[in-house]
């Protein structure tokens, strides 16, 4: 099935977005953790990730499975990300916009950096690569196939409008305008977490400079980010 999909779509690689979560959202689940079963099909994100990463390996694709994991942007998703890394030990995978998956729940605001723990786990597993998804301050728009998380993020839309839709009853899409503010505690910490990850991952060939355009910032902000 994976090989047929690649051929039919004339694609170069496989990416999975919130594995199982987009479908679960259609059955009124508003979250789906790594070992939480989809209410309709009884499949967990862990099973999906292991099956897809094995298929990519067996097909000999040059690019590893591209993973947008569970619980993007959720305080405490650090634990989910670490569990995901451990589950995929020995398999070639690429973790996307890892900054958005590196949040703890410490402190008065119940929001903290998990960058050190993520970097430690990545440094210990040479088969994993990642891109940062750096946040830059200013106006942008978030665009994602992760309807579940875009629905949750719509409460913070700036300006107050958003769109979510079902793509051919088979996938998801959400677009939410957003403004990152340097005087906002959460936004400022997101900015710092991204920079921490750049500095803490030992192998520069396994960590890539991105803003997850346009979700963390438009790519036109790259010169400023590089200067940082």
Regions found by a protein language model. Give the residues of each.
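Metal-coordinating catalytic core of metallo-dependent amide/deamination hydrolases
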Residues: 1-166, 176, 212
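A general structural motif
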Residues: 44-45, 75-77, 184-194
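Short acidic (Asp/Glu) and glycine-rich catalytic loops that position anionic groups and cofactors
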Residues: 61, 94, 169-175, 202-207, ...
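His/Asp/Glu-enriched, well-ordered alpha-helical/loop segment
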Residues: 190-228
């Amino acid at each position: 099935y994976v090989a047929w999909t690649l051929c039919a779509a004339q694609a170069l690689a496989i990416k999975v977005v919130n594995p199982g979560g987009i479908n679960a959202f259609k059955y009124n689940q508003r979250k789906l953790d790594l070992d939480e079963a989809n209410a309709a099909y009884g499949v967990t994100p862990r099973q999906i990730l292991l099956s897809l990463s094995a298929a990519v390996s067996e097909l000999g694709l040059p690019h590893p499975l591209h993973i947008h994991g569970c619980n993007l942007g959720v305080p405490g998703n650090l634990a989910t990300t670490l569990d995901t890394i451990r589950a995929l030990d020995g398999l070639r995978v690429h973790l996307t916009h890892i900054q958005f998956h590196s949040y703890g729940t410490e402190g008065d605001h119940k929001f903290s950096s998990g960058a050190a723990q993520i970097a430690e786990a990545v440094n210990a597993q040479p088969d994993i690569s990642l891109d940062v998804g750096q946040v830059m301050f200013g106006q942008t728009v978030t665009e994602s196939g992760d309807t579940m998380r875009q629905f949750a993020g719509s409460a913070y839309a700036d300006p107050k409008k958003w769109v979510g839709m079902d793509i051919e009853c088979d996938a998801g899409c959400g677009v939410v305008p957003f403004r990152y503010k340097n005087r906002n505690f959460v936004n400022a910490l997101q900015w710092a977490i991204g920079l921490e990850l750049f500095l803490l991952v030992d192998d520069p060939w396994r960590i890539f400079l991105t803003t997850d355009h346009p979700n963390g910032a438009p790519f036109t902000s790259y010169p400023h980010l590089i200067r940082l």
